Amino acid sequence: MSRGVNWRSMNTARTGRERWQGVAWIAVSATGFGAMAIFAKIAYQEAVSLTSMLFLRFVIAGLLLAAWGVLLGMRWPRGPDLLWLVAMGALGYVGQSFCYFAALKYASAGLVGLLLYLYPAIVTVLSALLYRRRIGAARGWAVIAALAGTALTVGGDLHSQPLGIALGVTGALIYSIYILAGEKVLPRVGALPAATVVMLSAAAVYGGAVAAAGPALPGSVAGWSAVLAIAIFSTLLAILGFLKGLEKLGATDASTLSTLEPLVTIGLALLVLGETVTGLQLAGGALILAAVIYLARHGAQAVRD
């Protein structure tokens, strides 16, 4: 779920073989991000605490990203840009990830995955309120469709608790603020350096939380497998896959294809966790994804880390 990319920074589309390679990379990325909720549910079943899980996720992924950046000769952010990215990681991404993973304790994986995808609509509204950007009638209807879809999705859910729904919506709101906060700094520093600093900053915060509360590390092969899958497959590989796909497809197509994420979450939740999906949830999810696709293709800004 964390990419650190400004969608507007790349708009070049490719054709032929390179384009299909881009589609494959985005499919890998979406599968990784979409599967994260499933791995988190498994880790909870193995008595891994939320703070320990997120500390391991961020420290493993952050160190591997840093090593990859060193091999590529990555230029590290400095000065005010570095401080801004540290704040984005230590405050924004810590808050968003806490809400998302905490929501999974009280709500179905499929519902939490769909609620996160409210962020393009929220970003559109916040951009209009904070920066006086014109929404326009069509994008306004897309925002309304996303909200209506959310109402249907929540109303059709038979198992989630109100706290889980509230945490899911709060996570989407924090993520939207995080997006707007990074809108200007990310084009200057680049996606990979930004994602690395954000990850390591979040790791430092969760490391402090683990030290204060005491670790609750995985005590089984299943627990460690789930945590490592979150850090490597659902974070590191998902980020790299998105960057490769963005390079080959451009921002608009990459963002549109990334709407596979909640579909992956819902499908895996059904197959692996035995979660049920009602007709109202399917209808609501379809409305949310339709709104997201429209916003992605018509000027919605997004920064994914």
PLM features per residue range, with description:
Residues 2, 21, 40, 45-95, ...:
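Transmembrane alpha-helices of multi-pass small-molecule transport proteins
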Residues 38-50, 102-105, 151-163, 210-227, ...:
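Membrane-interface helix termini and inter-helical loops of multi-pass transporters
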Residues 26, 30, 56, 97, ...:
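Helix-helix packing/entry segments at the starts of transmembrane helices
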Residues 65, 86, 126, 135-155, ...:
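Hydrophobic transmembrane alpha-helices of multi-pass small-molecule transport proteins
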Residues 1-52, 56, 157-184, 305:
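Glycine-/small-residue-enriched transmembrane alpha-helix faces in small-molecule transporters
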Residues 43, 53, 57, 103, ...:
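Hydrophobic/aromatic residues within transmembrane alpha-helices
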Residues 32-39, 66-110, 115-116, 152, ...:
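Specific transmembrane alpha-helical segments of multi-pass solute transporters/efflux pumps
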Residues 52-63, 91, 97-132, 170-171, ...:
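Specific alpha-helical transmembrane segments that line the substrate/conduction pathway
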